[in-house]
Amino acid sequence: MQDYKLPAGLRDNFGPQATQKESVRHYLTGLFQRHHYTLIETSLLEYRDVFGPYELQAESLYRILEADGQDLVLRPDLTLPIARFLVTTNVSLPTSFAYVGEQFRRNRQLTGLYNQSTQAGIELVGFQSRRAELECLTVISELNRDLFNGRLLVELGQARLADLVLADLPANERQKEAIKAALFNKNVPDYEAAIAPFKRERHYPFLAEWTWLFGKADVVEKMVAPLWVNPAAREAMQEVLDLAKLVAQLGDQELLVDFSTAAPQAYYTGVTFKAYADQTSTYLVSGGRYDNLLANFQEKSEPAIGLGIDVTLIAQLLERSAPRDQAKPTLVFCQLADWPTFAKRYGGDPAYEACLADSLVAARTQAAATGQQLKVMNEEGDLIDA
């Protein structure tokens, strides 16, 4: 007999998991509508070239070969399809989009990670003002409050900071890449070895402290104040610190700044943000500014900022923390001729569930198996003990 298993890395959702995921999706759609974003659904299949700016190896993509030889992929990302949409339509800018959809990305085997996930997010295109960053962080704050009671940890960073700091360091590209790799991977021994040749440079005091430049904004601000960096790097850091002060006023949530973190993707150009839950080291929300994104598809670029929300992971965390002793609906058995009466009287009441068994004996068996109370509806529509 053939084994009809799912391909590795994919899964089915049912029962409480599927219910929780749909609940999160419904909440996010309502959140987006309250912020007056335009909902968008892009195609699940795209040409491979759409994801040229995306840092992903070919073996990580689900690929489909068209009859004409064109290379299609199941989308591994939902931001770049929106960029493709913008340059192939006449949508006027600025505009604010929101989406919920599936993405597919092959992970290494034996990592325990799934290759399919549901992502929601927003894309604010054509907005240069820092108000766009605050809009994204307000959405994160509302999600944090509504779904996690403020328990999410929000982290701010700067995508270009490493390149700005190292821009005028007298080092070759190989040395600069070694510094960045060790910094982003939090590999302190390799990092110290990478910066050792530059002890005589005025950059060195900052380089020596760089791996420690994370924490609460006021603490980090005091740490960087006496350290020399070039004006462009100083301005980039101050932008993040100023933004952190405004975000801190949004409500009760833990907020950190990390100047030693990598951008989520290579196309990011400014402030970045992530949100973590205490139950996982994987971020639930990530995003930031990417003002050069449309330049990959057309000559003219547009300022843009956005965030992605991992619906699948959020649903998993909420489902795990949900109380297990929730009351089950009462199972109601009735004769076939009395079904219209049941539907009118009890059909819209979540406290009751129609029993689809053919007989009262089968209904009792079903109730025993599911742990539900069983009632019988008589001809008058009253419920009596079974």
UniProtKB/Swiss-Prot annotation:
| Gene Ontology terms: cellular component | cytoplasm
Any one GO molecular function term: transferase activity
Superkingdom in the source lineage: Bacteria
The record's keywords, sorted A to Z, are: Amino-acid biosynthesis, Cytoplasm, Histidine biosynthesis
Q: Name one Pfam family in it.
A: tRNA-synt_His
Which pathway does it serve?
Amino-acid biosynthesis; L-histidine biosynthesis; L-histidine from 5-phospho-alpha-D-ribose 1-diphosphate: step 1/9
Q: Per the annotation, which location comes first and is thus the protein's main one?
A: cytoplasm
Keyword Amino-acid biosynthesis listed? The answer is yes
Q: Where in the cell is it found?
A: Cytoplasm
Would you kindly state one Gene Ontology biological process term found in this protein's UniProt entry?
L-histidine biosynthetic process
Q: What else is known?
A: This function is generally fulfilled by the C-terminal part of HisG, which is missing in some bacteria such as this one.
Q: PANTHER family under this entry?
A: HISTIDINE--TRNA LIGASE (PTHR11476:SF7), HISTIDYL-TRNA SYNTHETASE (PTHR11476)
Job description of the protein:
Required for the first step of histidine biosynthesis. May allow the feedback regulation of ATP phosphoribosyltransferase activity by histidine.
How this chain assembles, per its entry, is: Heteromultimer composed of HisG and HisZ subunits.
**Family under the similarity heading:** Belongs to the class-II aminoacyl-tRNA synthetase family. HisZ subfamily.
> What is this protein's record name?
ATP phosphoribosyltransferase regulatory subunit
**Source organism per UniProt:** Limosilactobacillus fermentum (strain NBRC 3956 / LMG 18251) (Lactobacillus fermentum)
